[in-house]
């Protein structure tokens, strides 16, 4: 080995090669396609992975500031397009690509990010969660949108035209750009924190997918999902569907449509109130008419036309009770008298005059009621006795004999048939006004 030969250190060789990479115009900006490999997500820091194809592999690094601009989440095996520079990493002596931009190969980065977030939130149930109903008559409506855009003007104009008593409060926010998503979510939280709103509208006008992208950010979607106020989303045109639209309680195609969903038409409300008033009045009239018909029907029923039918079944029981009343009347009177004496003695001891008078009045009422009841029972029983005597008189044998009937006795025994008689036997014939003696001369036993 020649002594004149100069040996390089590993460091010197590595630094020489590194400078070659840095000054090579073809390696300063490389457009590369490959498949993501060995990717392990590292939140809030630099990302390390590899890019490979069927025959080769290259290490890749993407610094935190560059990765923050990536709209989708890289996945193992995903084909991507990257832009970066090739450099040499001195400690290992290996070359790698420093990725500055990255997007999916074949599908736009924003679309890929949209689909990934949509799938994630759907799995968490944010799209299928129960939707909060919109209040029918909101008093205060919060609007999160740009201060200078046409959205707030359309909402205010539509609300004043339809329901002028509602108050619109603007929570101004950027609606496009990198800082817009965080500001939109903060304003949603502010509107909820105030606690005196009925409805929340978020939105912006139409634009490209990049312009609408803040409404596809996860931070905005979660702010909408956590809102205690019902949220109406009006982002872009009718054909645009953002993540915010899917999470919101109601989606509106335009800001004007959002205002129309938020408030009713004042004149329609008045008309509805008048119709409801008429309906209630008619219902009341029908109710009164039905009750009047029922009352008329009741007035013609036997309860009023033949009231005696109500107590006919109780007359017999009343007779029995009258008898018991007659028997108990004196006992009740005696008990009442004894009670009166006791009360009178107590009152004499207590000496309140009004209590004595009250007791005397009660006793007098009891005596009058007892006397009336006793007299009524006596009259009823006297009538019953008269009717019974008349019935017995009609059945009396003497009464029957006055009509020409008589009966025969033999030896002071009533003769019931010819078998009790003998020829030549003397019998007595009893008639209404006396009796006569007769002798049996012939007995005929025929029918």
From Swiss-Prot:
What is the enzyme's class at the highest EC level? hydrolase
Q: State a GO cellular component annotated for this protein.
A: cytoplasm
Q: Could you give a single Gene Ontology term from the biological process aspect?
A: DNA catabolic process
Q: Does the keyword Plastid apply?
A: no
From the Swiss-Prot or TrEMBL record, state where the protein is found: Cytoplasm
- Which molecular function GO terms apply here? exodeoxyribonuclease VII activity; nucleic acid binding
| UniProt superkingdom | Bacteria
Principal place where this protein is found? cytoplasm
Keyword terms of this UniProt record: Cytoplasm, Exonuclease, Hydrolase, Nuclease
Recorded catalytic activity of this chain's protein: Exonucleolytic cleavage in either 5'- to 3'- or 3'- to 5'-direction to yield nucleoside 5'-phosphates
Q: One Pfam family of this protein, by short name? A: Exonuc_VII_L
The UniProt record lists the EC number as: 3.1.11.6
Family to which this protein belongs: Belongs to the XseA family.
This chain's function reads:
Bidirectionally degrades single-stranded DNA into large acid-insoluble oligonucleotides, which are then degraded further into small acid-soluble oligonucleotides.
The UniProt subunit note reads as follows: Heterooligomer composed of large and small subunits.
This one is known as Exodeoxyribonuclease 7 large subunit
Origin organism is Lactiplantibacillus plantarum (strain ATCC BAA-793 / NCIMB 8826 / WCFS1) (Lactobacillus plantarum)
Q: Supply the source organism's classification.
A: Bacteria, Bacillati, Bacillota, Bacilli, Lactobacillales
